[in-house]
UniProtKB/Swiss-Prot annotation:
Bias type Low complexity, positions: 31-48
Membrane side Perinuclear space: residue ranges: 101-122, 181-190, 277
Gene: npp-22
Protein name, per record: Nucleoporin ndc-1
Cited function: Component of the nuclear pore complex (NPC), which plays a key role in de novo assembly and insertion of NPC in the nuclear envelope. Plays a role in postmitotic nuclear pore complex assembly potentially by promoting localization of nuclear pore complex proteins to the nuclear rim.
Gene Ontology BP terms: mRNA transport; nuclear pore organization; protein transport
Stored Pfam families: Ndc1_Nup
Transmembrane parts of this sequence: 80-100, 123-143, 160-180, 191-211, 256-276, 278-298
Compositionally skewed regions (Polar residues) per UniProt: 1-12
Lineage: Eukaryota, Metazoa, Ecdysozoa, Nematoda, Chromadorea
Cytoplasmic side: 1-79, 144-159, 212-255, 299-588
Key word Transmembrane helix present: yes
Cellular compartments annotated: Nucleus, Nuclear pore complex; Nucleus membrane
GO cellular component, one term: nuclear pore
Length: 588
């Protein structure tokens, strides 16, 4: 995880300042032996012996307590999301049965029956049964699949994914069969139900393997009736319906093909009469479409409940000798934890502070008492700087490997090349010391070890899709891209806000370093994208554009805010050139 390692690319002075100003880290700097040796759990007693004197219990830090509290909170939210999805599935069940009860042969009585059937107690057992089964299936999907660092698609070889397909199929088949029985529908007793079962099986596989289970924050947070209405109206129903229609058409086509090919062998040629049964086609396509639509809407509900933002306070300017568990859950402590989901919440909260919360920004720009140190600013800025600096270094190293300047190429160098010439550029060195012998010519013509996958065949693509192929490790994942985007937007928006709100100048002291890091990272991403242009797999380039957009918008805001004052920073010419190129300004 980026930002978790303390041996990152920041200077020793910054690390020392961070350890000095972070109260949570200061508590954890003592050796483990001193705390464990004084613990009563490790003292010898007449009734208890210690098996090994070298075994010491790891002390529980405030970071462990924060993570335990957060995991308990997320567990409660996931159960609540599962119950909400089960409630939504119950509503879908009631609507499905009501539609199945409609018939043109008895319009008035069927309409009355479809509207009031669920009120009678004899129908409650089926409704409760479907609701419980839906809650169980939703909880399994949320716990096993819904993660903040989840891939866009699950691999076909994933055991839990295959189990999820089986559970989704059983749950949905139970849903459909119960609806047919309650509505007294004829398709539950013929070969039609076999075709419907096949369509549901394929639709279940599409639900699991083509759904995006990544946990992410919603743009609209539901906390009132008005925000609930806004959230409902903001959903892209046209896009969702198009995707659901395509997946439903795949399942529908498979069921029709089954009737054409297998139907005569199982039920005789009478099975072909289903092809002329219009209600059968409507029900078949409608069941597949509602299954896909329910899966998309339920994921929106899960993100709305599980990913509800948490507001973390800042520590007071004075030292608290015996803080309560609530007082230890401060933003500087939370942003330093190892839990990826908790750090994601912390960076989102920091971004919210930088953009919308003027009252809490006062704490960021405040000084500690006594001492008057910018403790809060250092505590929230250094993790963001480490994260962005690590990404910059990875971009630089990966770009060098793509163009062939890596340590793997040293084994093809000629042994007769002088040692001093190794500092020369590669092409210049080859031109100066290329020999006429066949061995030297073969070595100079050796291919560069790059990861060019442009000639990947059809079988390789199929194996990669099914999860059997060996895929290249991405330089940055989608989760890391969102993390770095949040860090950049929070950090540099605080720089912009400091122009009018930083009374003590705690941010202006780091302004040159922050702008330098911003320009270096933009240049590193641009170099990597150019080196990646000839490679077929551009997944990480797509994710990098998320970070690149945040960095460029941040640079434009900083330059617009400070304007001509940036000339006093004496930035290097390459960084000034980057600023002029992106911001289209001549002030530097």
């Amino acid at each position: 995880m980026m930002g978790d390692s303390h041996s990152s690319f920041t200077t020793t002075t910054d690390e020392h300042l961070y350890n000095q100003f972070s109260p949570g880290r200061r508590k954890n700097d003592f050796p483990a032996a001193s705390s464990s040796s004084s613990s009563p759990n490790l003292r010898r007693s007449p009734n208890r012996t210690v098996s090994s004197p070298r075994v010491q219990q790891k002390p529980i830090t405030i970071f462990d307590q924060i993570v335990d509290w957060f995991q308990a909170e997320i567990s409660v939210r996931k159960r609540l999301a599962g119950a909400a999805c089960g409630y939504l599935s119950t509503i879908f069940f009631i609507v499905t049965v009501s539609i199945l009860k409609l018939t043109i042969w008895a319009p008035f009585s069927s309409v009355q029956d479809s509207l009031a059937w669920w009120i009678y107690p004899n129908a409650w057992a089926s409704i409760i049964f479907v609701g419980i089964a839906s809650v169980a299936m939703s909880l399994f999907s949320i716990i096993k699949f819904c993660k903040v660092d989840q891939l866009p698609r699950l691999a076909a070889t994933d055991t839990f994914a295959l189990a999820g397909v089986a559970l989704e199929f059983v749950t949905r088949l139970t849903f459909v069969y119960t609806a047919f029985c309650v509505a007294d529908f004829s398709f539950s007793r013929e070969f039609a139900f076999v075709a419907i079962s096949l369509a549901i099986a394929i639709s279940s596989a599409l639900v699991v393997f083509r759904s995006d289970y990544q946990l992410n924050f919603s743009h609209i947070q539901v906390n009132s009736v008005k925000t609930l209405i806004d959230f409902g109206t903001s959903l892209p129903y046209a896009n969702i319906s198009e995707i659901c229609g395509i997946d439903a058409a795949i399942s529908y086509t498979a069921a029709v093909a089954l009737i054409l090919v297998v139907g005569p062998m199982v039920s005789g040629f009478s099975a072909w009469w289903l092809l002329l049964n219009i209600p059968f086609h409507v029900v078949l396509f409608g069941l597949c479409f509602t299954q896909q639509f329910y899966s998309k809407i339920s994921m929106k509900i899960v993100n709305q409940i599980v990913m509800k933002p948490i507001s973390f306070p800042f520590p007071p300017p004075y030292t608290v000798h015996s803080p309560t568990p609530e007082q230890t859950r401060t933003l500087p402590n939370v942003i330093e934890t190892d839990d990826s989901l908790l750090k994601f919440f912390a960076l989102h909260d920091l971004r919210t502070i930088a953009w919308n919360d003027e009252k809490r920004r006062v704490d960021v720009f405040s000084l500690s008492q006594p001492g008057k140190h910018p403790r809060n600013w250092k505590a929230v800025s250094l993790p963001c700087v480490r994260m962005l600096d690590e990404l910059c270094s990875r971009m630089t190293v990966s770009a060098a490997r793509l163009v062939g300047y890596s340590w793997d190429d040293h084994d093809i160098e000629n042994e007769d090349v002088p040692r001093d010439a190794l500092l020369m550029p590669r092409k210049m060195r080859e031109m100066a010391y290329r020999g006429t012998g066949q061995s030297r010519q073969q070595k100079s013509m050796a291919p560069i070890r790059s990861h060019n996958t442009q000639t990947v065949g059809l079988l390789s693509k199929i194996s990669n899709f099914l999860g059997f192929g060996v895929t290249e490790k991405l330089v940055i994942s989608r989760f890391d891209a969102h993390m770095n985007a949040y860090a950049a937007e929070a950090l540099y928006m605080l720089v912009v806000d400091s122009m009018g709100e930083d009374r003590f100048g705690v941010v202006q002291k780091d302004l040159k370093d922050l702008i330098t890091l911003l320009c270096k990272l933009i240049a590193a991403i641009d170099t990597y994208e150019r080196a990646k242009a000839s490679v077929a797999d551009k997944s990480d380039v797509t994710f990098l554009r998320i970070v690149d957009a945040s960095l460029k918008s941040s640079l434009q805001r900083v330059v617009t805010t400070f304007g001509s004052h940036l000339s006093s920073l004496n930035l290097p010419e390459e960084h000034s050139r980057t600023i002029r190129m992106i911001c289209l300004t001549d002030e530097l």
